[in-house]
């Protein structure tokens, strides 16, 4: 097929981030300069974000057989780019105290962003696999970036081995689907699945194996065992990327697959996904109750958040509101996670050994960093789904979609899970206002609010509050991205 200027405009974010990767690579080869490479990375990601406006003017189109650029792709590309930008911003002060190679961090984040953008635009199982590998491989290096620390290295090895196993399941599942349907394109799969083929054992086995592979990447129960260890072992800025960009991109492509190929029409698939969602919500929240490490706590809570999103995915066949629910929920989850991990990153910067991730490190934070404590409180309330925050709007949408699709047992799980979640989120919030210990351990810089990371954290808190009270701009944006059939 011929590539026209229109196609090139549609691919602008991908091309800009790809070009930034090359420029940063050459810059590192030419001369090591931490500030220069960080600046180049941030400029590239900002340019890719701005280019989405031009992509919107070009309209929806199939750029290649592997990729479709439309409102849906633009929304998820934007969320991935925002998460990558925040990761680079949080990483800069952290890397200032890091004695080994600093510049490669940005290179790995950019390559992973490239994978996220590819996933957001994927319209074919080959693009799905390429995107997942492109996002996973840099993460192996990023998770083990503080490799002189035993915990970081252990987390990296764990994630690498388990990720390789999950990828093999995913690939084998795709092979079985291809063997039965003779197609890998989402659209063609949808057509071939239309005539009662979903009862074929080979096809069900293929989708089952794909659910195993994707369930690992999304850290859904029972494929979640790596999550708390990796979140705790990885540097705080990397945990930010892992919790946001990686999950959002992969969930976006799963959403598109389910939209084109009506896999959810199969009762067997719906039951399996329902059990996974139920287990993820209940188990994720129960395990978070006993955590005293804030990164482990956020790791377990991310399992339950993906469980809530799975409820909307199961309800996808019952109306377009599901897509809207997922878009709003993911935006709320992104800003809340950026704020929470941003506070941990600020407290842990510059690099001086292990991160400030113990709950004890945050005890009495309000008495010497009141604004930072207020930001953390807002993020915890949003993740818990308290009214007047963006997290509540997302959770309300998920409940509405569940009720609309008559998924009563999953609606009950969401309500019970939210009640359990309220306890441990408030436990973190309350500890910020207790009496500070005599000898505080780690602390954020005095003028943290004037640093780039501090500004990102404050903007996240502001968006969570403003969009929680007045969500219409976000809902309108998500509705624009919804019609893609």
From Swiss-Prot:
Q: Provide the membrane topology annotation.
A: Multi-pass membrane protein
Question: What Enzyme Commission number(s) does the record list for this chain?
Answer: 7.1.1.-
The set of disulfide-linked cysteines is none
For molecular function, the Gene Ontology terms on record are: NADH dehydrogenase (ubiquinone) activity; NADH:ubiquinone reductase (non-electrogenic) activity; quinone binding
- UniProt KW Aminoacyl-tRNA synthetase keyword: no
Task: Give the record's GO biological process terms.
Answer: ATP synthesis coupled electron transport
Keywords attached to this entry: Cell inner membrane, Cell membrane, Membrane, NAD, Quinone, Translocase, Transmembrane, Transmembrane helix, Transport, Ubiquinone
Q: Which reaction does it catalyse?
A: a quinone + NADH + 5 H(+)(in) = a quinol + NAD(+) + 4 H(+)(out)
**Source taxon at top rank:** Bacteria
Which GO CC annotations does the UniProt entry carry?
A: plasma membrane
- Transmembrane stretches in the record are 8-28, 35-55, 71-91, 105-125, 127-147, 159-179, 203-223, 235-255, 271-291, 297-317, 326-346, 373-393, 408-430, 455-475
Cellular compartment(s): Cell inner membrane
Note the InterPro entries from the entry.
NADH-Q_OxRdtase_suN/2 (IPR010096), ND/Mrp_TM (IPR001750)
Family annotation (HAMAP family): NDH1_NuoN_1
Entry similarity comment: Belongs to the complex I subunit 2 family.
NCBIfam families listed in its UniProt record: NDH_I_N, PRK05777.1-1
Q: How does this polypeptide assemble, per the annotation?
A: NDH-1 is composed of 13 different subunits. Subunits NuoA, H, J, K, L, M, N constitute the membrane sector of the complex.
The entry's function note states: NDH-1 shuttles electrons from NADH, via FMN and iron-sulfur (Fe-S) centers, to quinones in the respiratory chain. The immediate electron acceptor for the enzyme in this species is believed to be ubiquinone. Couples the redox reaction to proton translocation (for every two electrons transferred, four hydrogen ions are translocated across the cytoplasmic membrane), and thus conserves the redox energy in a proton gradient.
- What's the protein name? NADH-quinone oxidoreductase subunit N
Report the source organism. Answer: Salmonella arizonae (strain ATCC BAA-731 / CDC346-86 / RSK2980)
């Amino acid at each position: 097929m011929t590539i026209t200027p229109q196609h090139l405009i549609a691919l602008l974010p991908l091309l800009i981030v790809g070009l930034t990767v090359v420029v940063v690579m050459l810059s590192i080869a030419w001369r090591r300069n931490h500030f220069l490479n960080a600046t180049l990375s941030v400029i590239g990601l900002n340019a890719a974000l701005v280019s989405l406006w031009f992509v919107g003017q070009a309209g929806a189109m199939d750029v290649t057989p592997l990729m479709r650029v439309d409102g849906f792709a633009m929304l998820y590309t934007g969320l991935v780019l925002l998460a990558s930008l925040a990761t680079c911003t949080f990483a800069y002060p952290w890397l200032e105290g890091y004695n080994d190679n600093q510049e490669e961090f940005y290179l790995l984040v950019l390559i992973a962003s490239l994978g996220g953008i590819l996933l957001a635009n994927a319209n074919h199982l080959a693009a799905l696999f390429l995107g997942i590998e492109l996002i996973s491989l840099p993460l192996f290096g990023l998770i083990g970036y503080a490799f002189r620390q035993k915990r970081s290295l252990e987390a990296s090895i764990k994630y690498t081995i388990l990720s390789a196993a999950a990828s093999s399941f995913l690939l084998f599942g795709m092979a079985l689907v291809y063997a039965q349907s003779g197609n890998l394109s989402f659209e063609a799969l949808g057509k071939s699945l239309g005539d009662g083929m979903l009862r074929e054992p080979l096809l069900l086995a293929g989708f089952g194996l794909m659910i195993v592979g994707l369930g690992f990447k999304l850290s859904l129960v029972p494929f979640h065992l790596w999550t708390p260890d990796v979140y705790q072992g990885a540097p705080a800025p990397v945990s930010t990327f892992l919790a946001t960009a990686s999950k959002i991109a992969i969930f976006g492509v799963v959403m598109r697959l389910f939209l084109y190929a009506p896999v959810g029409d199969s009762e067997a698939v719906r039951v399996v996904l329902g059990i996974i969602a139920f287990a993820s919500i209940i188990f994720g929240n129960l395990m978070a109750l006993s955590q005293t490490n804030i990164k482990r706590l956020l790791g377990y809570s991310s399992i339950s958040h993906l469980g809530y999103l799975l409820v909307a995915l199961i309800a996808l066949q019952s109306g377009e509101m599901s897509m809207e629910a997922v878009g709003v929920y993911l935006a709320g989850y992104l800003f809340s996670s950026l704020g929470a991990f941003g506070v941990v990153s600020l407290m842990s910067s510059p690099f001086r050994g292990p991160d400030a991730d113990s709950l004890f490190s945050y005890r009495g934070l309000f008495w010497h960093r009141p604004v930072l404590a207020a930001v953390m409180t807002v993020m915890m309330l949003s993740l818990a789904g308290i009214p007047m925050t963006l997290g509540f709007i997302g959770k309300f949408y998920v409940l509405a979609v569940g009720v609309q699709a008559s998924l009563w047992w999953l609606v009950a799980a969401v309500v019970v899970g939210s009640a359990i979640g309220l306890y441990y989120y408030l436990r973190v919030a309350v500890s910020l206002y207790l009496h500070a210990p005599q000898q505080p351990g780690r602390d954020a810089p005095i003028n943290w609010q004037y640093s780039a990371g501090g500004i990102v954290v404050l903007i996240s808190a502001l968006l969570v509050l403003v969009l929680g009270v007045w969500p219409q701009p976000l809902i309108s944006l998500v509705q624009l991205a919804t019609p893609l059939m």
